[in-house]
């Protein structure tokens, strides 16, 4: 892998990423569990952190800056009398072995601590069975979340020779204290209302049916000055501010930004530079709480891996809010906005539901077009970690004197995520994209688009991402019954900087090229600002200026406005991302349906002489196959490697007068159970 290509690389990336191994110095770490900590056996993920001596191991675990050495291992049916041992490590057995980051000699002095994120068994309504960490008002952290087991932090020296370190899980991370009166306990948090900031939470029937357990979604509702709950005649447009886990905070820094909070509460924007005070826009601003099993938010859409979160929010939570608060429940008065993850959610919410929302103001959104998934040409590259010329692909960057400095590569960040979870369960960025954009694998977990160790891209898996490629989705539904070419014209506003720290400008540029190439230069309003990095409001506007922009759009597109939003563009026929379609195409049933056994192409009985032709069957992308002929129920000849789609030949010999023949193919893949499949049997007789 080439590490340099005219770009500066931060010191953490100067040495190309290698696989970390705890056992390079014959080091073993044994972790037991204290009395009365567990109520039964559990599955989960152990995370072991070696931090610099005297440093809190959780102080900095970020991929771009951590000084720690971190290791992870899955445990199965771990109980009171069990000991989990971490030693060695390597890329070939991520399901049961040790994953480590980064690679250095272990000799030195450290503060060491271990954590165990417990998994809960879930049997989903489509028949799939998975083991996942369900968050509980903590925003689904990748380590040390509610319910996690922890050991005391211990200062010690690693000698560099054979050594055994013993730790004990002796405590459990507690639930945050309840202060509100919401249902559902700690799920989605529990907060007390204030005069302007109200909290709601509902049990989602749709999500609960999918997951086979009670599931909740919530919202933080910021009311404008002068709001009177009893005045049903005065109603307000709504700005849905999409973001990561918001906890108890209000949107736009309400309750944390003193100046904004004071101005919002008074309904008066203080004048600056001699300008007079002016009234604040009269909006209700809503932030959703939808922490999910794979991340701190669900991405607000219906997915095969996380279920009908889009329907839970749009068809259950929003109607509940409309019933309880004085909103204008019309598309023109419902605006989506957000940045980064929230940028993608806001754009997707409008694009999938133009019948429900009026417009989106989406800033530096996650990849809108997978021709540029961050910096990965996902449809054309063979590897997600390096280009054809061998250059590493960056994931996180900064700029110094207008020179790009790569802080982490895609390979480095993916390998870092493997410390915290396999099968896309790290609760981190690349893994949640697998869960949101992709289908289910046969193992029940997200069908990953590439090998997380090597970066090899699986084109068939990538095909299942296309319904979530918003550029492709719009183009594919441009002039059919959804008629998105007319329905969405003038309703999409996107902003990004050319120096986006996560390379998200590439996806925006590809989206603009696709949709404005079809609809003309003003079909979508796309702003790509030279030199700007990740962050800030839409077009880097000051907050009150931006909120006024949104308010003006609503007024202009109201029934009495200058350009009313026509009801012919908000019909239900334009709706997409229907859960029944999503689960049919990408759920457990679809995973089962795409599997095929090996086949012999002849009828049940043939004469000896002709060459027998066989295929290996169909398997999930990334499964490595080995085959063997079975003659009269016994293996015949050596195992040989095959690939899906290969035509396999067998030439009968005169050794047997008459015999039965079948092909046995064994498939292996990281985080899948090894599986052997037999073909049909044919009987072969001599001429």
Which residues does each predicted region cover?
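Short beta-strand elements bearing conserved aromatic residues within extracellular beta-rich modules
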Residues: 46, 219, 625-629
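Classical eukaryotic N-terminal signal peptides for Sec-dependent ER targeting/secretion
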Residues: 1-13
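N-terminal signal peptide
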Residues: 16-26
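Short proline/glycine-enriched turn/loop motifs at strand-loop junctions of beta-rich domains
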Residues: 42-43, 195, 215-216, 618-624
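Ser/Thr/Pro/Gly-rich low-complexity disordered regions
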Residues: 581-687
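Non-catalytic cap/lid and distal C-terminal segments of serine-dependent acyl enzymes
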Residues: 52-94, 100-583
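Short, ordered, surface-exposed loop/turn motifs in non-cytosolic proteins
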Residues: 39-50
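A short, amphipathic beta-strand motif
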Residues: 27-35
């Amino acid at each position: 892998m080439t590490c340099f290509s005219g770009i500066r690389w931060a010191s953490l990336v100067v040495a190309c990423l290698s696989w970390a191994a705890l056992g390079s110095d014959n080091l073993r770490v044994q972790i037991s569990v204290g009395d009365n900590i567990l109520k039964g056996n559990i599955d989960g993920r152990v995370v072991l952190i070696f931090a610099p001596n005297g440093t809190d191991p959780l102080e900095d675990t970020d991929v771009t800056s951590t000084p720690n050495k971190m290791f992870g291992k899955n445990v199965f049916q771990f109980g009171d009398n069990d000991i989990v041992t971490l030693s060695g490590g390597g890329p070939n057995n991520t399901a049961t072995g040790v994953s480590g980051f980064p690679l250095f000699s272990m000799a030195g002095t450290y503060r060491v601590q271990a954590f165990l994120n417990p998994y809960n068994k879930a049997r989903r309504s489509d028949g799939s069975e998975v083991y996942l960490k369900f968050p509980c008002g903590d925003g689904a952290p990748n380590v040390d979340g509610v319910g996690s087991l922890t050991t005391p932090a211990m200062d010690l020296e690693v000698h560099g020779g054979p050594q055994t370190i013993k730790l004990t899980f002796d405590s459990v991370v507690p639930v945050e204290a309840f202060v509100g009166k919401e249902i559902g306990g700690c799920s989605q948090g529990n907060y007390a209302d204030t005069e302007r900031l109200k909290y709601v939470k509902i049990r989602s029937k749709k999500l609960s049916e999918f997951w086979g357990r009670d599931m909740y979604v919530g919202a933080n509702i910021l009311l404008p000055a002068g709001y009177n709950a009893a005045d049903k005649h005065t109603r307000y447009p709504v700005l849905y501010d999409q973001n990561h886990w918001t906890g108890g905070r209000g949107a736009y820094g309400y309750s944390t930004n003193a100046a904004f909070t004071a101005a919002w509460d008074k309904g008066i924007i203080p004048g600056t530079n001699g300008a007079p005070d002016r009234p604040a826009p009269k909006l209700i601003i809503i932030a959703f709480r939808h922490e999910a099993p794979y991340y701190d938010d669900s991405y607000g859409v219906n997915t095969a891996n996380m279920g009908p979160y889009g329907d839970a929010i749009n068809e259950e939570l929003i109607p509940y809010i409309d019933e309880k608060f004085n909103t204008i429940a019309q598309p023109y008065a419902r605006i989506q906005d957000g940045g980064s993850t929230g940028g993608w959610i806001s754009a997707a919410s409008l694009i999938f539901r133009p019948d429900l929302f009026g417009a989106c103001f989406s800033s530096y959104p996650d990849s809108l077009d997978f021709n540029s998934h961050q910096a990965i040409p996902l449809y054309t590259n063979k590897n997600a970690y390096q280009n054809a010329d061998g250059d590493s692909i960056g994931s996180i960057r900064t700029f110094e004197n207008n020179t790009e400095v790569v802080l982490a590569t895609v390979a480095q960040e993916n390998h870092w995520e493997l410390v915290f979870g396999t099968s896309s369960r790290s609760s981190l960025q690349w893994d949640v994209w697998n869960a949101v954009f992709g289908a289910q694998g046969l193992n029940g977990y997200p069908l990953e688009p590439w090998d997380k160790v090597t970066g090899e891209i699986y084109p068939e898996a990538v095909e299942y991402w296309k319904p979530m490629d918003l550029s492709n989705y719009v183009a594919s539904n441009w002039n059919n019954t959804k008629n998105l070419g007319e329905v969405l014209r003038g309703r999409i506003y996107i902003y990004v900087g050319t120096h986006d720290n996560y390379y998200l400008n590439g996806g925006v540029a590809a989206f603009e090229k696709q949709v404005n190439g079809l609809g003309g230069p003003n079909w979508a309003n796309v702003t790509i600002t030279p030199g700007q990095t990740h962050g800030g409001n839409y077009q880097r506007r000051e907050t009150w200026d931006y909120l006024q922009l949104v308010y003006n759009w609503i007024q202009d597109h109201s029934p009495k406005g200058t350009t009313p939003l026509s009801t012919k563009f908000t019909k239900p026929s334009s709706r997409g991302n229907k859960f029944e379609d999503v689960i049919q195409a990408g759920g457990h049933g679809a995973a089962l349906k795409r599997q095929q056994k090996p086949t012999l192409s002849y009828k049940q009985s043939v004469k000896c002489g002709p060459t027998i032709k066989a295929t290996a069957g169909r398997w999930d992308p990334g499964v490595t196959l080995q085959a063997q002929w079975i003659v009269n129920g016994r293996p015949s000849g050596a195992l040989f490697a095959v690939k899906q789609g290969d035509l396999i030949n067998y030439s009968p010999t005169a050794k047997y007068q008459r015999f039965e023949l079948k092909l046995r193919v064994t498939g292996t893949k990281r985080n899948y159970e090894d599986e052997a499949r037999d073909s049909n049997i044919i009987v072969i007789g001599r001429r």
